[in-house]
Curated annotation (Swiss-Prot):
The keyword NADP does not apply. HAMAP family: DNA_HJ_migration_RuvA (MF_00031). It comes from Fervidobacterium nodosum (strain ATCC 35602 / DSM 5306 / Rt17-B1). GO terms for biological process: DNA recombination; DNA repair. Homotetramer. Forms an RuvA(8)-RuvB(12)-Holliday junction (HJ) complex. HJ DNA is sandwiched between 2 RuvA tetramers; dsDNA enters through RuvA and exits via RuvB. An RuvB hexamer assembles on each DNA strand where it exits the tetramer. Each RuvB hexamer is contacted by two RuvA subunits (via domain III) on 2 adjacent RuvB subunits; this complex drives branch migration. In the full resolvosome a probable DNA-RuvA(4)-RuvB(12)-RuvC(2) complex forms which resolves the HJ. InterPro entries: DNA_helicase_Holl-junc_RuvA_I, Hlx-hairpin-Hlx_DNA-bd_motif, NA-bd_OB-fold, RuvA, RuvA_2-like, RuvA_C, RuvA_C_sf. This is Holliday junction branch migration complex subunit RuvA.
Length: 188
């Protein structure tokens, strides 16, 4: 198995990233948000899942271990393949998905593009015990939305806001969170 790939980021092309390792360039299918903040030539660490079928060997990659584990859980659901799992992870956050499955919220899951009511019900039935409710900080979500509206990617915004809240956990004013996150993002 290929668990982690470390190499040089070579760009993004049609739903996959290109990673060079000692002159060999791997095409790794990934969700829309993972690795969106990288530039060509950056060193990159990719959590991977190799899926072998009769026709193909495909590497799926993620920017976090949690996202990879979520992908692995999703592809266990009957009639839900890796392509659909990638679409799901491209359309929502792991926390949103975790909360919707853990609480049995069919409506929330059905709001994800590509997920109908029957698929949502199947996901809940087959995965309910594998996900836990994650406490969501409303100020954090609002700050992330504001940063995304300013042109930052969800990943950049989430990372910056998380860093602000880790360094100053008592900040509850959204505008202060955004201001501090912008300082962090300006350094990138």
């Amino acid at each position: 198995m290929i668990e982690i790939i470390e190499g040089i980021y070579k760009g993004r092309s049609e739903g996959k990233i290109l990673v060079s390792i000692n002159g060999v360039v791997f095409g790794i299918i990934t969700d829309a948000e993972s690795f969106s903040e990288f530039n060509e030539g950056d060193k990159i660490l990719v959590y991977t899942k190799l899926i072998v079928s009769q026709e193909d060997m495909t590497i799926y990659g993620f920017d976090s271990k949690v996202k990879k584990e979520t992908f692995e859980k999703l592809i266990k659901v009957s009639k839900l393949g890796p392509k659909t799992a990638i679409k799901i992870l491209s359309s929502t956050t792991v926390d949103f998905l975790s909360n919707a499955i853990a609480t049995g919220d069919v409506e929330k899951l059905s709001s994800i593009p590509g997920i109908g009511r029957k698929t949502a019900e199947r996901m809940i039935t087959e995965l309910k015990d594998e996900f836990e409710v994650v406490e969501v900080n409303e100020e954090m979500l609002e700050a992330i939305e504001a940063l995304v509206s300013l042109g930052y990617s969800k990943t950049q915004a989430r990372n910056a806001v998380s860093k602000v809240l880790k360094e100053s956990p008592n900040i509850s004013n959204v505008s202060k969170i955004i201001k501090e996150a912008l300082k962090i993002l300006a350094k990138i």
